[in-house]
């Protein structure tokens, strides 16, 4: 089911005398999610991603804008009429009911022409359980399950109504690191197996990039960039996106462009044709450094971390915004850990320039 958002906006009015002005939680969200794709809404806490999800679900009414499922305008429809499956951050399972009863609950509350026979309800419940691989837990209570198993029950309950769109709100935030990795792989498998158009909300960029077909990066209610995860990582539209994506984080420097060259400190570190003379912010991905004894960029060496397949060189520079520069190089490199300085050349495709307002400045690297 294709999902289309047109100028979707949610504004909360001032709460009362002496309060701050109106809060724009989501501002002019335009987006089309192709049928059967998994899209990650990504951004820091308070950026509007959960509000956007609740607008799609129907739990909130938009201030303006439209929501389409396929060609149907569902903006005015209540949640139960939209055909959505929702999985909340805290799962919202009924503790006194078995897994089977929790999965059946949405079906038992259908009325009128939508009401199903008991046989059909059981069939659907076991089909959903099979998809999430919990058939052997149907007689258990939620308190007897691990966090990952509870998550699967919540997903099965959302799937049992055969929704047109599946919505997941921070579904992994309550799990430990091992279960998060395992469960996000399960979500990807389930989405591919069912083919349901899915919107996944998270503040964890690694989660979003690892399982999403597309990601939407948000800040202060405004969409910053939309695209395939690797595309957004490789070609950030602005400094916020560049800094938000990537682990370790991108290295950010105060720089300037003079005569087609990027200067960081007193060193000309890269040729950047097509850019006017100006002060810039230069951002360099950790993998954008090449160790070179006569390299153009000199930093103070503070440490080396050998990680097996690669090495992280930790350094400092007076023009760097980060507390430490982290440069990832291949394990075949030999770093003199006793040295006080380390020199690099920079990979042009891993260097980004931004203006004072944070917008990307394109440049042509030297041949």
Residue spans for each PLM region:
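Helix-to-loop junction immediately C-terminal to a conserved catalytic motif
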Residues: 57
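The feature captures the beta-strand-to-loop junction immediately N-terminal to the Walker
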Residues: 42-44
């Amino acid at each position: 089911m294709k999902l289309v958002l047109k100028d979707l906006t949610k504004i909360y009015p001032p709460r009362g005398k002496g309060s701050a002005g109106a809060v724009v939680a989501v501002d002019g969200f335009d987006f089309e999610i192709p049928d059967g794709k998994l899209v990650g809404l990504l951004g820091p806490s308070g950026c509007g991603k959960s509000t956007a999800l609740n607008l799609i679900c129907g739990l909130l009414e938009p201030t303006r804008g439209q929501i389409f499922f396929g060609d149907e305008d569902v903006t005015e429809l209540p949640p139960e009429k939209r055909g959505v499956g929702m999985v909340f951050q805290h799962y919202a399972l009924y503790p006194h009911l078995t897994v089977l009863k929790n999965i059946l609950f949405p079906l038992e509350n259908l009325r009128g022409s939508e009401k199903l026979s008991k046989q059909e309800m059981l069939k659907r419940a076991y089909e959903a359980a099979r998809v999430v691989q919990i058939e052997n837990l149907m007689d258990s209570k939620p308190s007897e399950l691990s966090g990952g198993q509870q998550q699967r029950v919540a997903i099965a309950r959302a799937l049992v109504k055969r929704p047109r769109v599946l919505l997941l709100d921070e579904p992994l935030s309550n799990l430990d690191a091992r279960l998060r990795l395992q469960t996000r792989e399960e979500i990807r498998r389930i989405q591919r197996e069912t083919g349901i158009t899915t919107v996944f909300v998270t503040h964890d960029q690694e989660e979003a990039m690892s399982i999403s077909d597309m990601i939407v990066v948000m800040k202060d209610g405004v969409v910053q960039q939309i695209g395939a995860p690797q595309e957004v990582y490789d070609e950030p539209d602005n400094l916020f996106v560049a800094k938000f994506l990537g682990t370790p984080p991108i290295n950010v420097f105060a720089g300037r462009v003079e005569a087609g060259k990027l200067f960081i400190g007193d060193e000309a570190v890269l040729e950047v044709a097509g850019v006017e003379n100006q002060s810039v912010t230069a951002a360099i991905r950790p993998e954008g450094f090449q160790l070179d004894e006569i390299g153009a960029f000199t930093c103070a060496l503070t440490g080396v971390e050998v990680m097996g397949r690669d090495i992280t060189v930790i350094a400092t520079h007076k023009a760097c915004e980060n507390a430490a520069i982290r440069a990832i190089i291949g394990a075949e490199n030999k770093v003199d850990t006793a040295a006080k300085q380390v020199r690099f050349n920079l990979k042009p495709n891993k260097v980004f320039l931004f203006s004072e307002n944070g917008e990307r400045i394109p440049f042509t690297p030297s041949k």
